[in-house]
């Protein structure tokens, strides 16, 4: 429930002004996309058979900004190669570089300028790279970006998270961390 609320807040909050006052070019399309890890155990649904579909879906829906989950380094590369019109940030949650899952953020480069970004781990120490905390099944992290819309000149805050699917305590504590990070990082920017 809290996870859904946070995700909704991250992608649906008011975009600076009432919808009726917005020109059509001020529309913002955002998406959260769990692409699923790359594993041969998925048989015909493995990543090598899904990667083109994933990129084509992003283009079909003309997404401005999206957060993806369960993205390994090779999948990150595949998305970057297939979506060269998008800028991206993302690091591996196990080493802060490329090892393990990434929770990247992608944005249309022609529309947005990246002003700032960062990462935090769902742990007692948010800077503890790769730490599994509380009763989580695996380490988890969040990514955030401050983007400036080149059309409207307005800034926004976007956060992408992937909360643990097993640990009840981990989910509750992660939700608290998300709210804390939103308050500390977003300031008065729309989320």
Regions found by a protein language model. Name each.
Residues 36-38, 112-113, 123, 164:
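Active-site/binding-pocket entry motifs
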Residues 4, 16-82, 94-101, 119, ...:
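N-terminal, active-site-proximal structural segment of metallo-dependent hydrolase catalytic domains
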Residues 65-159:
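Structured beta-strand-rich core segments of catalytic domains in phosphoester-bond hydrolases
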Residues 23, 139-161, 168-191:
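His/acidic metal-ligating clusters that form di-metal
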């Amino acid at each position: 429930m809290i996870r859904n609320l946070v995700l909704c807040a991250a992608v649906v909050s008011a975009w600076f002004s009432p919808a009726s006052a917005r020109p059509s070019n001020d529309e913002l399309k955002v998406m959260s996309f769990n692409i699923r890890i790359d594993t041969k155990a998925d048989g015909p649904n493995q990543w090598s058979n899904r990667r083109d579909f994933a990129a084509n879906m992003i283009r079909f829906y003309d997404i401005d900004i999206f957060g993806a989950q369960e993205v390994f380094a090779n999948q990150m590369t595949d998305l970057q190669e297939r979506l060269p019109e998008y800028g991206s940030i993302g690091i591996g949650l196990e080493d802060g570089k490329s090892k393990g899952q990434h929770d990247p953020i992608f944005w249309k480069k022609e529309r947005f300028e990246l002003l700032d970004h960062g990462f935090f781990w769902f742990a007692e120490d948010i800077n503890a790279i790769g730490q599994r905390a509380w009763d989580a099944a695996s380490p988890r992290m969040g990514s955030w970006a401050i983007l400036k819309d080149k059309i409207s000149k307005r800034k926004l805050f976007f956060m992408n998270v992937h909360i643990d699917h097993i640990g009840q305590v981990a989910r509750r504590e992660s939700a608290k961390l998300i709210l804390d990070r939103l308050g500390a990082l977003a300031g008065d920017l729309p989320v």
